[in-house]
Amino acid sequence: MTRKIVILTEIIAPYRIPVFNALAGRAGVDLQVIFLAETDKALRQWRIYTDEIRFSYQVLPSWRLRAGKHSLLVNRGLWPALDAARPQTILCGGYNYPASWESLWWARRRSARFVLWTESTERDMRAGRAGVEWLKRHFVSSCNAFVVPGKSSFAYIRTLGVSEQAIFTAPNAVDNTFFAIRAEKNRAHATELREKLKLPSRFILFVGRLVREKGVFDLLEAYAKLESSLRSQLGLVFAGDGVSREDLAQQAQRINPGVVCFPGFAQREDLASLYALAEVLVLPTHTDTWGLVVNEAMACGLPIIVSNVAGCSADLVGEGWNGCVVPPRDSEKLSVAIDSVVRDGELRQRMSARSLARIRDYSPEACADGLAAAAIGAVTRAL
């Protein structure tokens, strides 16, 4: 029996396209994706790979209102779009948009099943946000089932009074095959690539927005704490852009010896080159619901150093196994972790093999399996 599913999600994120393609290809699934906006140019410089889309979709008209770090995405046309699609199940990505609530109301009026797809973790709970937490609990109490990417989100949604039977795991995923193949090809031309991209012969890699909350200044400080003999042969590369780039670059000039590079924002094709040449990926973030750059780096066979507040740390990184897990805002422990990985080539090889082995379970197909299971499971769960 075919089940009509609508996924409601914010933007056309490149890493979601393979997942939705896999779900649309499932027997018994009639999928339509409704995007609230094409992209968010203020935060995302992603190329939009619409030519790779193999599922039915539409982008709603939208307006994004900003006030400091906060934004509100407002849409029109959602109710008619849902009436036209007539889904039996809505998979809603998040609860922080007006469209999230509108789709919930539509589901209640039309007797459709409603599944919340959330990456929130306990770290999202902030002091002084009691009103937000109340609204969140009210939203959650109206859902039939829930999709989470991993252990941290699973634990958090349980604190909101949700039973284990109502929670389905759809592991966060990127196109592992794309990154693995690209990395292998790029390593075959490592010397040429380093010269072309003006990269150090050995380097630590950070990928993401260059903003304080990503821990970029902690990483720079940790690099400065490495022994000078090690820094003289090991660079640090910040791949990305953001409001802290200029401050980072100025502080980096004071580190001697050492080489700190800022190649700018990289699309996925160029990212594969950086992953292929790096010795370790470091994500010392202060807050992150997951951290998909870790998936990308592991698909390229990199050891990982990540802060324990990143949602992915509980699922993807084993301490001393394929990397290190450190507390946020602790440059001393971060420096020790970096030193332990970059000094031992044999250890890096073992960690590399383990990263490749673990990330196989975090594929677009596995994520699609979790989404499909939630859509089916929602049918059997009454509110």
Where in this protein do the model-derived segments appear?
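A conserved mid-protein helix/loop that constitutes part of the nucleotide-sugar donor-binding site
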Residues: 18, 202-225, 236, 243-247, ...
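A short, histidine- and acid-enriched strand-loop-helix "catalytic/donor-clamping" loop
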Residues: 98, 112-130, 142-145
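Nucleotide-activated donor-binding/catalytic signature segment of Leloir-type glycosyltransferases, i.e.
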Residues: 246-266
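Short alpha-helical donor nucleotide-sugar binding micro-motif in glycosyltransferases
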Residues: 265-266, 273-278
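Aromatic "clamp/platform" in nucleotide-sugar-dependent glycosyltransferases that forms part
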Residues: 286
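Short hydrophobic beta-strand element within catalytic cores of glycosyltransferases
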Residues: 303-307, 317
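Conserved acidic donor-binding segment of nucleotide-sugar-dependent glycosyltransferases
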Residues: 318-320, 324-331, 340-346
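A short, well-ordered alpha-helix in the C-terminal region of glycosyltransferases
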Residues: 340, 347-361, 373
